Amino acid sequence: MLLNQGIFAMHIRYSEMKMRAISTLSGLMRHHGTDPREFLNATHQFPELGDMLVHENALRHALMRLGGRKLVFSNAPRHYVEQVLGAMGVRRYFDAVYSIESTRYRPKPSSAGFHVLMRAHKLDPHRCVFVDDMLENLRAAKRLGIATVWVSHGVTKPRYVDVRVASVLELPRHVFRNARG
């Protein structure tokens, strides 16, 4: 999802809320027997989603220029991820979508989800690139041998981040020799 400068701070707060919601879901499942499908359905209802997203035609062009297979790996429920990708007009540029349901409700940064995705697509982690805005997720990917790209306006790049970009539109300019496949 591309975010303009005006809503960047809101995105940071939302990212923090996502991590709390994921922790909340795990706790509700473990301690209260909550049905994760019901929880995720109730917490991911956005009738005005299309109006909430920043649409940039350049995103489609950037995705077309990226080589290799492209997979979406999200902690959100499938219906929401598909809705976002569809509203942005980019679904066709991705080979597969992995949602929290795909990982049996073990969200990033758990390595379990990465393993599910890599097994299903017969991926060598040393030939993959993981792009995310959450450092915890990037750290988990790096531990598995995956090259990492941090989408952030942050200045200090941690050691486990290979490349920092301010926008996903910058991705085609970065070539990863180890990410063919």
Describe every region a protein language model picked out.
Residues A58-G67:
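Catalytic-core regions built around general acid/base machinery
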Residues H11-R13, F46-G50, G68, E101, ...:
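Short, contiguous strand/loop micro-motifs
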Residues G50-V54, V72, Y105:
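Short, surface-exposed alpha-helical recognition segments that flank or form part
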Residues R37, M64, L71, P77-R78, ...:
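Asp-based, Mg2+/Mn2+-dependent phosphohydrolase catalytic module
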Residues M1-N57, H79:
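N-terminal helical cap/lid subdomain that shapes the substrate entry/recognition surface
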Residues L28, L49, R69-K70, R91:
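A general structural signal for well-ordered secondary-structure junctions
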Residues K18-A21, H32, K70, S74, ...:
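Flexible interhelical turns and helix-capping residues at alpha-helix boundaries
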